[in-house]
Amino acid sequence: MSNPFPAHFLWGGAIAANQVEGAYLTDGKGLSTSDLQPQGIFGEIVTRQPGDSGIKDVAIDFYHRYPQDIALFAEMGFTCLRISIAWTRIFPQGDEAEPNEAGLAFYDRLFDELAKYGIQPLVTLSHYEMPYGLVEKHGGWGNRLTIDCFERYARTVFARYRHKVKRWLTFNEINMSLHAPFTGVGLPPDSDKAAIYQAIHHQLVASARAVKACHDMIPDAQIGNMLLGAMLYPLTSKPEDVMESLHQNREWLFFGDVQVRGAYPGYMHRYFREQGITLNITAQDKQDLKATVDFISFSYYMTGCVTTDEAQLEKTRGNILNMVPNPYLESSEWGWQIDPLGLRYLLNFLYDRYQKPLFIVENGLGAKDKIEENGDIYDDYRIRYLNDHLVQVGEAIDDGVEVLGYTCWGPIDLVSASKAEMSKRYGFIYVDRDDAGHGSLERRRKKSFYWYQSVIASHGKTLTR
């Protein structure tokens, strides 16, 4: 069997500033929305007081240990590392006229370290960590002013790193703003849909402005969007279930439609009309939105099912995406259903819809790891999960889908986004820290470290099909 992965395919991992860096007030950094949710994106929003602490304040101390960690990534053979720039390191309050030089200098050092090993950076401009100053003073993305603040930030980092970064993403999992409005757009969790969609509109305009700025300032760079790829199957072949899956998938595909096609799709006009939502969209907004992305990136962890059956729906109360379990799939320790074939399906679906290159920028298994008496960590469950998903990526490439690369989520253990846990481990590299923040922060290679090293070295030929 021929190897489907093209020669230019990028292999690596993905991390986010607020989940790895720590140093949460170091070198002039301001408070972010992430700092006000020390228990994760679905946790309570708290006011930070001097002397209090959250696990993300130190995280895995990547801010100080990045040379060691990047050396480990290089040992695995990474050709790409997805990171995010903490907006609050560059503009601590979000609305300053001038950037924070100490923050800019940190990422210069980080990119130089990656370049030393030939690892290409893939940089997310905003990954669940907008400046809290913009929320407190201006109402977050509910205020049109935030568009200008984001554009200033984007132009600042484009100018600074134009020779070091050639692939960019605007907003991480932008469609999650519907379900986690404080994390996504800086609005209170109980905000009504009209307010959330208006904030999302401002975010979409800001994303498009960043795309245009990138194209103007770094002509040889590419910039993409980033979606949470949550494909929802109909639970049954009942036509009502099939139609419901169409409606619910459009809830997140809407973001891609705007960012790829440059205008609001017709089905959203109907939705807004029926919901009584009137957005403030200016003629300039419509013009700005025409700046479309070069490629589509997405996270993929699971699929789900949807139904119109009220008895089945009752089981989903409190489920953020109103998914019902798929009876044909197994689940992880955290209840996330495992569906490798769903990744091939999603890749084909998105490519058929948009005809744009795709980049899988998050995929991984959160699990509890055990250190054996000899110090080894035998995470065969993680190897099996990643192997099966990568096999399906290869199948999608054989199907004719253009896939730029694969950066698995959490190549090193980090603080989980949803509940700020260390025990939910994704990494090939173990970090000695627990949910209470105790531990030496020592790094240790897991069995999966050597497995991924082999996969990359063979360009996917060692995958078990």
Swiss-Prot record:
Q: Where is the signal peptide?
A: none
| SUPFAM superfamilies given in the database record | (Trans)glycosidases
Q: What class of enzyme is it?
A: hydrolase
Q: Gene3D superfamilies recorded for this chain?
A: Glycosidases
What are the entry keywords? Glycosidase, Hydrolase
GO CC, one annotated term: cytosol
Q: Name one GO molecular function term.
A: 6-phospho-beta-glucosidase activity
Q: In which pathway does it act?
A: Carbohydrate metabolism; beta-glucoside metabolism
> Could you tell me the EC number(s) of this protein?
3.2.1.86
Reactions listed under catalytic activity: 6-phospho-beta-D-glucosyl-(1->4)-D-glucose + H2O = D-glucose 6-phosphate + D-glucose
The lineage's top-level taxon is Bacteria
Residues forming the catalytic site: E173, E362
Pfam families, alphabetically? Glyco_hydro_1
Family stated for the protein in its record: Belongs to the glycosyl hydrolase 1 family.
Q: Which PANTHER family match?
A: 6-PHOSPHO-BETA-GLUCOSIDASE ASCB-RELATED, GLYCOSYL HYDROLASE
Record-given protein name: 6-phospho-beta-glucosidase
Record the organism.
Dickeya chrysanthemi (Pectobacterium chrysanthemi)
Query: What lineage is on file?
Result: Bacteria, Pseudomonadati, Pseudomonadota, Gammaproteobacteria, Enterobacterales
Q: Report the gene name.
A: arbB
